[in-house]
């Protein structure tokens, strides 16, 4: 399948048309960003790592009967995905307090939450992706009440599958964010990516950060950290 016209450029990916209108080519970029794009650097090797990590995780989730847009990895930096209408929400699932959650509620990082907490953020760069609730979502006509219920159920299903997977890798899934797409048949699918860019991952024994916080907080180089996550995934498969 050939790469055709560029249709979208994001912070860390480019999307291209293919000869099949229902399929897109995704190119993962050697780009690291944080703070809604305010911090940005070229990082050689990062694109290939995120492409491979996301491919492995999406394949695993498909085996767990969790619907997603992934078709296949086609090169070091590229994969094919199903075309969906993206719902402009970031859905965050938190198992432990960390990041903005800890700051907002003055809860120490690493505090285990009694049950997973789901948060919604409106994907709008001009507004810095604000935290919103279900009433806002309905007012903005971003999703229907029935879709909100389905999105929350899907998010918890993904959380369970990912938590079990990372537990086997000696990694604690602190929190993660996902995006959801809508097919022409109005089926909701997991879309975008799941990688150390979108998850907080701590080593179970040392609490070492194995995610983008290493870049965000300037704790070190992210490529060796992402390579460690990939190697653990490959060992598990």
From Swiss-Prot:
It catalyses: 5-amino-1-(5-phospho-D-ribosyl)imidazole-4-carboxylate + L-aspartate + ATP = (2S)-2-[5-amino-1-(5-phospho-beta-D-ribosyl)imidazole-4-carboxamido]succinate + ADP + phosphate + 2 H(+). GO terms for biological process: 'de novo' IMP biosynthetic process; cobalamin biosynthetic process. Its EC number is 6.3.2.6. The keyword 4Fe-4S does not apply. It is an enzyme of class 6 (ligase). Gene3D superfamilies: ATP-grasp fold, B domain, Phosphorylase Kinase, domain 1. Pathway: Purine metabolism; IMP biosynthesis via de novo pathway; 5-amino-1-(5-phospho-D-ribosyl)imidazole-4-carboxamide from 5-amino-1-(5-phospho-D-ribosyl)imidazole-4-carboxylate: step 1/2. PROSITE patterns: SAICAR_SYNTHETASE_1 (PS01057), SAICAR_SYNTHETASE_2 (PS01058). GO terms for molecular function: ATP binding; phosphoribosylaminoimidazolesuccinocarboxamide synthase activity. The keyword Ligase applies. Keywords: ATP-binding, Ligase, Nucleotide-binding, Purine biosynthesis. InterPro entries: SAICAR_synt/ADE2_N, SAICAR_synt_PurC, SAICAR_synth, SAICAR_synthetase, SAICAR_synthetase_CS. Belongs to the SAICAR synthetase family. This is Phosphoribosylaminoimidazole-succinocarboxamide synthase. The gene is purC.
């Amino acid at each position: 399948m050939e790469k055709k016209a560029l249709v979208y450029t994001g912070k860390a990916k480019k999307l291209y048309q293919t000869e099949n209108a229902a399929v897109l080519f995704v190119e993962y970029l050697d780009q690291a960003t944080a703070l809604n794009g305010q911090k940005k650097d070229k990082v050689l090797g990062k694109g290939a790592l995120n492409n491979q990590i996301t491919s492995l995780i999406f394949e695993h989730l498909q085996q767990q009967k969790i619907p997603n847009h992934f078709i296949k990895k086609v090169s070091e930096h590229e994969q094919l995905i199903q075309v969906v209408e993206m719902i402009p929400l970031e859905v965050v699932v938190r198992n432990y307090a960390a990041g903005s959650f800890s700051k907002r509620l003055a809860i120490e990082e690493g505090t285990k939450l009694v049950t997973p907490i789901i948060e919604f953020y409106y994907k709008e760069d001009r507004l810095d992706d604000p935290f919103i609730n279900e009433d806002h979502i309905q007012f903005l006509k971003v999703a229907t009440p029935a879709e909100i219920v389905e999105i929350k159920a899907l998010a918890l299903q993904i959380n369970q599958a990912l938590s079990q997977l990372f537990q086997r890798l000696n990694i604690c899934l602190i929190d993660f964010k996902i995006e959801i797409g809508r097919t022409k048949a109005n089926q909701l699918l997991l879309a975008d990516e799941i990688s150390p860019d979108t998850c907080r991952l701590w080593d179970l024994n040392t609490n070492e950060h194995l995610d983008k916080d290493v870049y965000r907080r300037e704790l070190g180089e992210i490529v060796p950290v992402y390579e460690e996550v990939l190697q653990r995934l490959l060992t598990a498969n």
